[in-house]
Amino acid sequence: MKTVIRPDIRRKHIYLHQGIVYDRQPLLNGEMRDLHVSLLSPVGHRTKDTNRYPCMVWVCGGAWRGGRERAAEMLPELMFLAEEGVIIAAAEYRIIGEAVFPAQINDVLTAVRFLRTNAEKYHIDPERIGIIGSSAGGHLTLLAANNDGQFDTQAYSNVSSHVKCAVDLYGIADIEAVYQFNLNAIKQGKRPGRSNIPEEFPECMLLGGLPSDDPVRAKQAGGINGICEHTCPVLVMHGSDDHVVSIEQSEMYYHAMTAAGKDVRYYIVDGADHGSDEFFQEETRAVIRDFLNEKL
């Protein structure tokens, strides 16, 4: 059988660019680590394209343990944005055990400045960079959304780490509240399969100790505590049945943003657990897509 077809062009070819080193940082064991960013882009190495595209920096979750091998794991689920002409940049960051807070948000903001510095090379519109993250990545996303400069480093310091908008998927807004939640869960026998030793809670490993050991660091680690005049518009989505990060985190953040007069959209995903399939359906994608069409 021989057939001629003429497809309508409804989407661009999407390219994956990997192994891009954006920084090199020391670890607690004295070694150095290259930090990479992977891109989903409508522009390939041989593509003749002079356009600039908006960019969303993806920050992965995994209890602050996913910023290494798993940094680009969710890129397939973000193809729906790439097909809309949004460059997706999955940024690695130093994980717990490699560095303590604020190294993780330092790295994420360095990645933003790297992309802005190299905007022409990667066909990025430097005025249209946003951030999206889930779980622990949502925590870092909310910190980045404040645009307050307190976590900037000297790398690529000639440009801003400002993000235009942020999408937080079932993330953590208040580290101290998470710690108290987990302590209460121990008393109620609701932490099966997870450590009951406070020093081994992920949030304590992130801080390098209990929140009470360094209250200032613990407070700084909560995006809810840094809401200010520079905080960008934020979309929050959280599952009603989340058993890992309590929906109270997003409730508190929503009320704090509202009280501060900031632009916040809060969607409760009915019946959804932590990172469950409900977050990757067309209905939830449409919410994210519409928000970015308006704010990015």
Where are each of the predicted segments found?
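Alpha/beta-hydrolase superfamily serine-hydrolase fold, recognizing
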Residues: 1-296
